Amino acid sequence: MGGEVLNNEGMPLAELKQETIPISRSESSESLNSLTSTRSSSSNRPKTYFCDYDGCDKAFTRPSILTEHQLSVHQGLRAFQCDKCAKSFVKKSHLERHLYTHSDTKPFQCSYCGKGVTTRQQLKRHEVTHTKSFICPEEGCNLRFYKHPQLRAHILSVHLHKLTCPHCNKSFQRPYRLRNHISKHHDPEVENPYQCTFAGCCKEFRIWSQLQSHIKNDHPKLKCPICSKPCVGENGLQMHMIIHDDSLVTKNWKCHICPDMSFSRKHDLLTHYGSIHTEEDIPLELKYKISDIQQLVQDHGVQLGNSKHSNEQDEEKISNRLRKRRKLTENNNVEFLQNEVDLEKRLESGENGLNLLLNTVGRKYRCFYNNCSRTFKTKEKYEKHIDKHKVHELKLKILQEKEENKTLVDQNHKEPFIIQKETQSAGDK
């Protein structure tokens, strides 16, 4: 089939909207009767006043209405403007009605629930929802509905059987659902965008959920021989194995106590400090944001690394001031887990693992730092990545300065002892 949807009788489904379905309304309640008083009385006067603008065949019963039409429609004149917004209106009554939208005043209240609305039309539409005034006209069916579309859908699906799929006899309650069903499952012109990526499997599917059901039932997950993590397909397993290859991972997070220990993630370094060393050994730049440390140094005159005693005091000051803004290390673990879950979802969606691994299409921004081959599609993400490198360099610089200051302090402690010893030797002579 093409794009046109037919019912069981061969009639285009789009024409169902044009069909006239006999509808009977229940007798109005007192509230609905009151609505009739809000309707403007219709005039029986003939429309003898015609608009003389080219291409306009409008006619009106009064000259004042004709003048109003010409000023508003053809001349664009709207004399009544709202002082709270930029809207303007032809009639003063329209402006007064609009002003209710800027206030809490609701002049029309529902007699059933007391809800307030701003116009009579809104009150009419609201009060009708309290009564099932639309009655099914079929014999033996006394169902009532609040709204006309509900009644129409009931008649089409239950009594006329015009919302049944001609291919699989599946019934639907709404015409658009039948159209979507036929388009997804029975239209030969619609391609199958979801393909199975398992080796030797060439099956294609129209919807993503069908592909997921196929993978779950027909292709078991492959487990990693190192960590036993289940992976989707051979591509997913190959991509996962990269994290176990140390030669492909850049390790920029180094322990300042253990010279041979370096890690690829900050979280792993913090875990190392927690398991091997004490919390006091963790550098400040790992526990807090480097920007917060710089701000405290600038605002409060904290000096880092002048002496061992002052260094401990200043670090304690910084720790106390930053404790409330401290980033818990667990956040890094949560972020990593979210990335793992996102990666697994993308693999399960049928994306090729090689494309995920070498996704360089349209990535024109390449990181210029050594041992970093990251590429980006947008300048914003590229600059954000470069900022991370700069922050890391600043952290390394702070560590280096602390080590140099510590060396100078140790030398200053030794020099007085050497001078005193030389003086004593000279006195003995």
Swiss-Prot record:
GO terms for biological process: 5S class rRNA transcription by RNA polymerase III; regulation of DNA-templated transcription. Keywords: DNA-binding, Metal-binding, Nucleus, Repeat, RNA-binding, Transcription, Transcription regulation, Zinc, Zinc-finger. GO terms for cellular component: nucleoplasm; nucleus. Residues 406-416 have a biased composition (Basic and acidic residues). The lineage of its organism: Eukaryota, Fungi, Dikarya, Ascomycota, Saccharomycotina. InterPro entries: Zinc_finger_trans_reg, Znf_C2H2_sf, Znf_C2H2_type. A zinc finger (C2H2-type) spans 49-74, 80-102, 108-130, 134-159, 163-186, 194-219, 222-244, 253-277, 365-389. GO terms for molecular function: DNA-binding transcription factor activity, RNA polymerase II-specific; RNA binding; RNA polymerase II cis-regulatory region sequence-specific DNA binding; RNA polymerase II sequence-specific DNA-binding transcription factor recruiting activity; RNA polymerase III type 1 promoter sequence-specific DNA binding; zinc ion binding. PANTHER family: C2H2-TYPE DOMAIN-CONTAINING PROTEIN, ZINC FINGER PROTEIN. It comes from the Eukaryota. This is Transcription factor IIIA. The gene is PZF1. Residues 24-44 have a biased composition (Low complexity). Pfam families: zf-C2H2 (PF00096), zf-C2H2_4 (PF13894). Interacts with the internal control region (ICR) of approximately 50 bases within the 5S RNA genes, is required for correct transcription of these genes by RNA polymerase III. Also binds the transcribed 5S RNA's. Present with 1380 molecules/cell in log phase SD medium. Its main location: nucleus. It is found in: Nucleus. PROSITE patterns: ZINC_FINGER_C2H2_1 (PS00028), ZINC_FINGER_C2H2_2 (PS50157). Residues 1-45, 406-429 are annotated as: Disordered.
